[in-house]
Amino acid sequence: MLFNGTLICYNTKLAVGNADCLLQLPYSGPDFGLMHFSDMEVSMSNTERRVGTVSRGIRCPIIRQGDDLSEIVTTSVLEAAEYEGFSIRDRDVIAVTESIVARSQGNYCSVDDIAADVKAKLGGETVGVIFPILSRNRFAICLRGIAKGAKKIVLMLSYPSDEVGNELVSLDKIDAAGVNPYSDVLTLEKYRELFGVNRHEFTGVDYVEYYGDLIRSCGAEAEIIFANNPRAILPYADHILNCDIHTRRRTKRILLDAGAKAVCSLDEIMNAPVNGSGCNEMYGLLGSNKSTEDMVKLFPRDSRALVLDIQKKILDRTGKCVEVMVYGDGAFKDPQGKIWELADPVVSPFYTDGLVGTPNELKLKYLADNDFKHLSGEALREAISESIRKKDDDLKGNMASQGTTPRQLTDLIGSLCDLTSGSGDKGTPVVLVQGYFDNYTND
């Protein structure tokens, strides 16, 4: 048995436990007889934590339009804490996926709403649609609305891949064909002659064929070209919808400077209600997803009040001040498919004030291998802890901070939450992150 820190080893089993429980593990080593933990070199006291950052997916009910999301999130987190036996602490982060925020708001629009807005803003004749991402969920349904709002669509696809890395054709094929993607403009016929049919690695879709057929099915004429210079669209159309996400402002500026008559970005389509629809004043169609065959769920709007309300409810019920954020796509890149997982305009559109800024951290490996390479054991631990306690408020340029990921807190935590919650059937649209702001010195 084990009592008051005494470890007893038997010939065939190792018994480890305390006054309340006993765990027996297989053991085939020698009999060490009686041993006390006090005889062992232990570098951490009994009062210190053994766990740092913890990310938990929180199960919630299915969210419908009109639901009190603030109350549902608060209750779900507190019930999970009670059921699973953990406590809410100051500076915990409660993250809510953008999908359930938009669902609770009822922030939707239809394909016909998109068509009406495109026609009103770009004239309804020939429209150049440039640099869309290759996605059935993200863009195809928007393209249906765009095509219904014009007589002809000239679709200009970037190559060899779209903005977030979905590949139309491999770089090896580009090299073998002697094509310069920075300057060469390819017609559909030339593209097929050089590269044939190329299907997406994961979906099996030939997006060139798919997008062309979709445009024609909506009653518009379709012409497809391939180029990476925005100006390449101007011989074909002077009313342009640029569909890139993170480079949209530069693309629009280049087109207007080059003489385009009218240019809209996706954030300017559905940025106001159409026939009573939802909208997003800041991001328009950016961040939208397919809801049904004819409806689009837009990125959430006006959710600053939501994160503040959840923060207040948790404070009122637990006495703890937590941070709260709404998150969408994480900003990570898939090394297999080479896809940058950020089809939303931002990782987090709304968050509480404690999530502003970037981490200010020292690199433990650097300190251990350089400043304190002559130390070990408790002396090393205390020296590193003292460095952390006395670190400058701004470590930019300090060699001891190199490799510590100087990115926005919301991008880092939002990416962690996106990976935790998943995008399928986990049923955890809320994530609780604990210990993110702790360091090696926190007990």
Give the residues covered by each predicted segment:
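N-terminal amphipathic/hydrophobic targeting modules at extreme N-termini
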Residues: 6, 12-23, 29-35
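Conserved mixed alpha/beta catalytic, RNA-binding, or beta-rich assembly cores of soluble enzyme
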Residues: 45-90, 99-443
